[in-house]
Amino acid sequence: MPQNSPIEKLTTAVFGFALAVGALSLTAANPETTADVVGGLVLFSLSFLILVVIWWGTSDIMSKIDHGRPVTIFLNIVLLFFVAIEPYLLNILNTSAELFPLSSTLYAIDMAFLMGLSAALCHILIKENKATLTAQQLRHFTIGRTNQFVCAGLFFLSTVPQFLEWTLAGMSVRVLIWFATLAFSLTISAKNRNK
């Protein structure tokens, strides 16, 4: 992506906004118990890590892709929409136990779309640049794309109603799937960067 291109500026602004609003949402939570404080910090940490990982990956992809193509612009704008609504959903997760079933489902769908769209952009990068990428770069982006698609699938899987009802150590299995997905993604990404 050319330095300071309009899409780069928009991407940086939207991701920065989402991270800032997510942090501010913690102040609106009005926790009443230690569990509320810990729960809010845990959910914010998950959100923060996912957004940073997607921002980092999207920046890497967009620096190597023809971002002037209509499909690339469309996918990037849709991705930014899902980034922009993430803090709103996170805020509802942190402030309303009554809305947790709905807000956690919407949050999982939002995360699935974020990861799926990132994977789609990576797929376009691979397709457009297969002839010019080194074998190592091709492997790196292929693993990254597959990792993102798998994570998108895991977030969609977490919307199954039983995962909301079941708990483990007092935490919803849905949220545990989110953390397992993040751990899986970070592990694969770290191994992929070290090769």
Language-model-detected regions and their locations in the chain:
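Multi-pass alpha-helical transmembrane bundle typical of ion/small-solute transporters
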Residues: M1-K195
